[in-house]
Amino acid sequence: MTKICAFFTAIVTWLTIVFCPAEAVEPVFGETKAHIQTEFNEGEFVMGKYDLVVSPSGDDNNDGSLSSPLKTIGRAKELMKANGENAAATVWFREGTYVIDDVIEFNASDRKNVTYRSYPGEKVEFSGAREISGFTETTVNGVKAYVTDVEINGNEDYFRSLFKDGKSLSRSIYPKEGMLKIADPAQGEAIAGSHAPDFFTHSLAFYAHKSDIPDFANPKDVEVKVMHFWCDEHLPVYSVDKTTGRIETTIASAMRLRVDDNYIFENVKEALSLPGEWYLDRSEEKLYYVPEEGDTPENTVLYAGVNEKILNVINGEGINFQGIDFINTGWDYVDGKHTGIPFPETHPLYKNIKYGTAHPQAAFEVPAAINVEASKEINFTDCRFENISYTALKFDKAATDCDVTSCMFNNIGANAIFIHGDFVVPASTQRINIRDCHISFYGRIFNNAIGILLTHAYDCELMNNEIHDGWYTGVSVGWNWGYSDNSTNKIKICDNLIYNIGNGWLSDMGGIYTLGIQPETVIAGNIIYNVGCDESAYGYGG
């Protein structure tokens, strides 16, 4: 069944609920109140028999005591394993920023029943960014800018995320206001997808209105971002012909390009003008930045998201994270496997392709900065996930009995939380609970992302969360079209506050979006408002 059929099925269900209310029955829950935030008590420091202390000023040759702390989590993990005990233990992190150059890996060899947490009252950050300074003043496009040399090493250290004072800075975009419109989608050169050709055709070229194309100094640094249907396309430029308006890209679109589809250009040197904007020149290996009020070349320190992932837990058990801030990661284009490369090698544009086409729905193939897979009892409490450029936290296939409690997710590039399993009945991913979390400004890079996305999982609770300011759906549960058996069931979606989503960019969304038959699933006590779909003639559903 196609997505449109599912959409109308959802509409019928909604109308039935609104206009054909069932006879009053005893509620599943006695009283529901949307999002009453639970305060978390971080407790006091008590050094246990098997505990260790880590500090940015420590030394991995130390014994890990309070007066002689270690320096890295890697060394703490080694000592925990060497201990050979399974009694409860804690690794206490003293205040500071821990730059994660290599992904922190946990597996079956790591000791169980260990909590990695912040020292009470201290701020602990695990960061995926490196510091950039040493700016000098210059002029770009008639405005004052700062410039510094950066080592890119080809593509190895190229970055697309930049942070300052805890916030994400914007790459230079064109135009500054509104959107551009596709003049001609060149559908004659497109390749039809596997089904529903009105939606799924793939393009490596389109024609812009010629007057909309700036004189790009470095066209191959530029990205075309198309917003249409329920998908935003990230299409790096391969070539531009201003005489005809033709633009070719290195990724094929996931969905059909149409006349008047909205798009913008990102990472445009000629558009660099507003305070806080930046542009990375690949050929010169220089970073340009338009200063904000109070900046000087000497005091400006920026942080480039060069590492995309921070933590990976596979076959782990009994590992807890408490009071840790995961921050400032980078991103790259998704090399899609779901759609892959739809163009045959004989196609004249095949030579352009550098990445496979990603799944068009819900930022499904975007990786996670923190990943948990085939693991049990991996818990996050009172943690902060901020300025994460990919999906922040993913519980992947065969993750079970995991809790995320009283955590904050802010300025997330894709999905804030993604719970995913194999399409088997019963689902292998089970009992993942998200409670008392605050999710804000998700989908900042991959706009079709979800606040909480759940696909193919069983017996999970999504309860008492506040979710707002995303470009797409707040909570999505299902991932199975039609009326066949569904591995997603027994899900509680209760007492969530969901608002200010959509914001007029994409279509086919909802505060809560469900698919397929889901026995024992309960949706109750949620408050949803300010849901807005694409405002153009193409917009619907939201």
Predicted regions and their residues:
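Extracellular beta-strand solenoid repeats
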Residues: 92, 99, 105, 117, ...
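Extracellular polysaccharide-degrading/modifying enzymes targeting complex plant/algal/animal polysaccharides
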Residues: 29, 38-41, 45-374, 379-384
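Short glycine/acidic-rich loop motifs that flank beta-strands on beta-rich extracellular proteins
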Residues: 102-103, 308, 330-336, 367, ...
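Sec-dependent signal peptide cleavage junction
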Residues: 18-30
